[in-house]
Amino acid sequence: MTIKSNTPAHDKDCWQTPLWLFDALDIEFGFWLDSVASDKNALCAHWLTEVDDALNSEWVSHGAIWNNPPYSNIRPWVEKAAEQCIQQRQTVVMLVPEDMSVGWFSKALESVDEVRIITDGRINFIEPSTGLEKKGNSKGSMLLIWRPFISPRRMFTTVSKAALMAIGQGVRRAA
């Protein structure tokens, strides 16, 4: 059974990653570019917006690339991430729904180095209209990680939501 979303159409693909999650991953990867952002929700000092047309432009970056793609059409973002990882010689980390039954996941397995499943809870994304975390995500989340200088290992790893939250919230408290 498919769960229908009550999110207005204009907000469906504009949800922001919670800061605690981004901060925890930023410690590990050192993000320089947010390749799917708006001027309101960019998480890096450098970002691409819808106007920049990220699917048809280069993701020039001097550090790792963060990508939380529109969930309505993930496949082209998977293809672009694989391409830009090699072209930019930078790690690309993509946050996606944990759904291994879809075609874009099979496509990702052709080139991804790591699939990191976030366990023990679902991510509450930031609603575009309110700026607040909203509960009720219908799926878990996982990270697809492309690394430029190794042959893809297609490894599956896990990390708990609680561990990421503790690290990420610690960053905010220390700042």
Regions found by a protein language model. Give the residues of each.
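Class I S-adenosyl-L-methionine-dependent methyltransferase catalytic core
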Residues: 1-175
